[in-house]
């Protein structure tokens, strides 16, 4: 199973970097045709990031987050994911929120987390982080993962 971090979805609506915008569109479209799931945490972060970073109107930001919610299966975090996130953050290996997302994703069988900022190639238990952005389009690793 494949999942993606908030930043991939935010780039869908960010015209300032056309290469990342196009890559995000390609990645999300491919995810829709494969066994993919999105963390409920990510859905909330999408709404917040679209409001804060891109200054989208609240109604539009909320609708974009809701669209992700309805287009993908979702997963949530439980107590064990919180414990893992606290341990990872306490050891300064990851931010609490990144660790929480990875722990929750791992618990439901996600094998690849597509993310720009969690460290390309990082292994976290049973999953691997893959940066989708290459120098001029999708990275080689995301191309292989998604069969692009």
Where are these regions (language model features)?
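Short, well-structured N-terminal submotif of metal-dependent ribonuclease cores
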Residues: 1-38, 53-60, 136-142, 147-148
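Alpha-helix capping/helix-boundary segments
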Residues: 8, 42, 81, 100-101, ...
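Substrate-recognition element of Asp-dependent hydrolases with the DxDx(T/V) motif
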Residues: 36-43, 115
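Amphipathic alpha-helical interaction segments
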Residues: 41, 45-48, 63, 84, ...
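Active-site-proximal, substrate-binding regions of enzyme catalytic domains
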Residues: 45-73
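Active-site neighborhoods of divalent-metal-dependent phosphate/nucleic-acid chemistry enzymes
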Residues: 71-116, 146
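Acidic, PIN/NYN-like endoribonuclease modules and their adjacent C-terminal/linker elements
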Residues: 102, 107-148
């Amino acid at each position: 199973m494949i999942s993606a971090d908030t930043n991939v979805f935010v780039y869908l609506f960010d015209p300032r970097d056309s290469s990342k915008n196009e890559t995000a569109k390609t990645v999300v479209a491919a995810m829709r045709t494969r066994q993919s799931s999105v963390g409920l945490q990510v859905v909330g972060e999408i709404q917040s990031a679209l409001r804060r970073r891109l200054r989208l109107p609240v109604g539009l930001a909320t609708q974009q987050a809701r669209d992700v919610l309805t287009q993908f299966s979702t997963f949530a975090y439980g107590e064990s994911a919180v414990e893992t996130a606290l341990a990872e953050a306490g050891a300064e290996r990851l931010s609490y929120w990144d660790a929480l997302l990875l722990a929750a994703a791992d618990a439901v069988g996600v094998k690849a987390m597509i993310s720009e900022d969690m460290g390309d190639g990082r292994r976290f238990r049973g999953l691997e982080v893959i940066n989708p952005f290459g120098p001029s389009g999708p990275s080689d690793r995301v191309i292989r993962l998604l069969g692009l």
